[in-house]
Amino acid sequence: MAYQMASLKIEMKEVVHVKPSKPTPSIVLPLSALEHRPYPDSIWPIVHVYQSPSNGQLDPAFVLKQALSKALVYYYPLAGKLVKQPNGKVAINCNNDGVPFLEAIANCELSSLNYLDDHDIRIAKQLVFDFHPQQDENEYPHPVSFKLTKFQCGGFTIGMSTSHIVCDGWGACKFFHAIVELASGKSEPFLKPVWERERLIGSITTQPMPNPMDETTAAVSPFLPATDVMYELFKVDKESIRRLKMSLMKEISCNESMEQSFTTFESLAAYVWRSRARALNLNNEGKTLLVFSVQVRQHMSPPLSDGYYGTAITEGQVVLTMKELNEKPLSDIVKLVKESKNVAFTGDFIKKTIDTLESNPENFNVEEGPGATLALSDWKHLGFMPNVDFGWKEPINMVPAPCNMFEYEGLCIFLSPSNHDPSMEGGVRVFISLPSVAMPKFKEEMEALKVITP
């Protein structure tokens, strides 16, 4: 039986600032060009869900704080503060301010919340740190913060919020893994972090990346702007993904002599983009944009060090009119996603992205009409699940929690299945936000995945 939101009570203790366990350098570190995006206060929050440990004598809050303190010796910039420099760019002041850490106690068992597998956003928001002190215009939130919530069953959640310009998903995962290794008894993390931001400094350019659409050509939805935005989590099982890919191959074989393979990301990205556009009832002649993050660590020349934990992403982009998106064979749209992803991996594209952000980060903004842009992020392969074990059991689930980065109607995240639902092995969870009035149509589109004829 689902737990009633009105009955959920969370008692919070005093906030503490966890500092490195040993002295660390006191310096100001500049960020890379890829971290100069025009959203320096965007936070990347996730909730890790753990069942009751077999050794009930261990206090997870104590263990996590001790391990965090040790990890910050290696990741000491994360114990500092983001500040704006005189040149307008953001840097990290390594002032040993510490990482905000909040311990809380919930009045229910995790099983009553279905281990967050239903992903009630109202609950998830209560499990991450909501720390917004008064700041002047030249200062930003802490690079990272934690909230550990204990439940009556002995299980607990770890809410980790990370500044999106300091760490991308891969970087945040490396940091979390270091904490886990130290919590489980290791004397040091296996992978030593490196700063290496100087590898990603660009040249001033007068030819920024072209804008794929502007506000005069962007599609519009009759449902936007909206005050009532919903967040839903859709489960796409392995069989539905197989049927989708088979149907795409069938389309190609009917129209081309040469077959082509598509990844799960490429196939689902195209399908979800089209489904969302239909749900929003975008106007036919307006343009709609799919933009997705592309991780380029191994595509640099030479590749970035394994210990690099900063932001190292470019963005793939596909733009079509709503009429084209709605009427083209889905396989054609998937090909465009694949081609855009491959372009984003190239050295020329990476350099142009870096140069544009170095010259004028504001040029990187994408103009959009209400609902015209879908921002897609793939979290399936970050490495948070399932081998993140504090010496107890591995996490049973990991979910995003909305904040200033997520509270708009143009977001979609692909997630790995939770360990709570064995039937979803090999599947994908699709997290999306839409106006409430558009969600029924999107649900209908997602249900259609189950009956696609290969």
Curated annotation (Swiss-Prot):
Source domain of life: Eukaryota
Use case: Disrupting the production of quinolizidine type antinutritional alkaloids (QAs) by selecting inactive tetrahydroanabasine acetyltransferase variants is a potential kick-start for the domestication of novel legume crops.
PANTHER family: ACYL TRANSFERASE 4, HXXXD-TYPE ACYL-TRANSFERASE FAMILY PROTEIN
Self-association state and partner proteins as the record states: Monomer.
Family listed: Belongs to the plant acyltransferase family.
The protein's name in its UniProt record: Inactive tetrahydroanabasine acetyltransferase pauper allele
Species: Lupinus albus
Taxonomy of the source species: Eukaryota, Viridiplantae, Streptophyta, Embryophyta, Tracheophyta
